[in-house]
Amino acid sequence: MIIKKVRTQFGVEAEVWKLGYISLDRVAKYGSITMNLYFTEDAEQYIDSKTQLIPEEKFDEYFESGGDLFENCERFMLENCYLFMEDGATHLNVY
C-alpha cells in the first residue's frame, strides 16, 4: 500500500493507493501495474486509478531479482511513476 494524498475529481482528498492489477510478460520483458485510489484503507470501491507501463530496461531490476512480487510492484511505482515520485508518497509494508 502506498500513501500519497491527491485531490480527486470530486474535490476531496484521498490517499490510500492499493495494487489493483499486475500484468507481467516475463518472456518479452514488459508489463504494467495499476494502483487504485481509495478514500480509506477499509473502503471496498476505488475512486481512481493510475497505470504505469514497465519498460524492458527496468523489468529485470524489479521483477527477476527475487523478493516479494507485491513489494517489488509498489517499489517500482514509487521509483518510476511521476505521481508517486513527487514529495509525500510513503510505502506501507502490509504483505
Predicted regions and their residues:
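Viral virion structural and adsorption modules
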Residues: M1-Y95
